[in-house]
């Protein structure tokens, strides 16, 4: 239930709270100073099914998951189904992207972007190390 195959375009992971704590961040134990737990950089898309901008972003993330397969993990968190994650990461507006580089501090990026803008963001924020 955690891994969703996206029409053959690549793997996009839908995160629930327990697997988020295990694979991305233990925000419960360290709410103000958590560390990224992954072995590849990741992008976490906080979204909702009713959000028009989120719907536009979703297929782009599916494409990027395929393009960056093996280099980057892309996760999706439905804030309607995961209110604890929404609250823990202070998500007030969606779409909201959490960028977790292997080294360095995670950052948030608010709003939607086209594919080229997202690729630039991934390259500069997550894969430039």
Label the model's feature ranges.
Residues 15, 46, 65, 69-84:
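Thiol-based oxidoreductase modules, predominantly thioredoxin-like and allied folds used
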Residues 39-42, 46-50, 93:
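Short pre-active-site segment immediately N-terminal to redox-active cysteine/selenocysteine motifs
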Residues 1-13:
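Single conserved hydrophobic/aromatic residue that forms the stacking wall/gate
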Residues 17-41:
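A short beta-strand-turn-helix
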Residues 18-21, 83-84, 116:
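Acidic phosphotransfer microenvironment of two-component signaling modules
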Residues 93, 98-129:
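Non-catalytic, surface beta->alpha helical segment in thiol-disulfide oxidoreductase systems
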């Amino acid at each position: 239930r955690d891994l969703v195959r996206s029409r053959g375009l690549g793997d996009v992971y839908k995160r629930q709270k327990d697997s988020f704590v295990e694979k991305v961040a233990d925000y419960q134990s360290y709410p103000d100073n958590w560390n990224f737990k992954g072995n590849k950089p990741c992008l976490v898309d906080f979204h909702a099914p009713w959000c028009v901008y989120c719907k536009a972003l979703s297929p782009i993330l599916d494409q990027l998951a395929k393009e960056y397969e093996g280099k980057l993990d892309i996760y999706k968190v439905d804030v309607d189904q995961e209110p604890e994650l929404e609250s823990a990461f202070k998500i007030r507006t969606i779409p909201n992207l959490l960028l977790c580089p292997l080294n360095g501090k995670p950052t948030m990026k608010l709003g939607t972007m086209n594919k080229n803008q997202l690729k630039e963001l991934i390259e500069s924020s997550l894969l430039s190390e």
